[in-house]
């Protein structure tokens, strides 16, 4: 159904742990090179099923190429790796909002596309075999409260709240685009 190419990009000028900038740079390069679909995943993902790329493309095509899809993994709450079409760039102008540094970037795209444009492929599985993060949450060495669980929980709650607010604002862009291109 499709040709697949993996792009490896290394830019040491991007601060360690600011994953969203890295994904935005890669997404822009692939978009400018006229790729139609994009899969964002970490280097600790192990694909357990075959055919997920074609199924992801078929799913998005059946939904006017608007939305988020991909294999599920060991996080049953959200998709933690994402498959989108070129329309994601046309809608937002980036892969991730620059306000998000690392944690909650996957929460954001689930929040922004849910419920109308989120299509998990439950027949495909891609396990996340990673260990502890190799970066500071939100690029903040003090985010975890130096072991104080109350501070850590409060910081997580605030980060998820700000992510939800951002997603609520960005949802309007999807509807605007969708209505314009009916």
Predicted regions mapped to residue ranges:
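Residue-level recognition of beta-strand->loop/alpha-helix junctions
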Residues: 10, 70-72, 122
């Amino acid at each position: 159904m499709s040709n697949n190419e993996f792009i490896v990009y290394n830019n040491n000028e991007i601060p360690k742990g600011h994953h969203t900038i890295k994904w935005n740079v890669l997404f822009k390069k692939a978009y400018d090179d006229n790729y139609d679909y994009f899969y964002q995943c970490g280097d600790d993902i192990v694909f357990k099923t075959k055919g997920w790329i074609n199924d992801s493309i078929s799913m998005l095509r059946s939904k006017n190429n608007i939305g988020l899809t991909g294999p599920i993994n060991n996080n049953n709450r959200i998709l933690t790796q994402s498959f989108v079409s070129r329309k994601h760039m046309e809608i937002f102008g980036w892969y991730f909002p620059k306000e998000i540094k690392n944690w909650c970037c996957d929460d954001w795209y689930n929040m922004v596309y849910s419920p109308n444009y989120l299509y998990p492929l439950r027949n495909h599985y891609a396990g996340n075999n990673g260990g502890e993060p190799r970066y500071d949450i939100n690029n903040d060495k003090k985010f975890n409260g130096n072991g104080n669980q109350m501070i850590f929980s409060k910081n997580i709650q605030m980060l998820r709240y700000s992510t939800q607010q951002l997603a609520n604002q960005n949802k309007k862009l999807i509807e605007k685009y969708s209505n314009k291109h009916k």
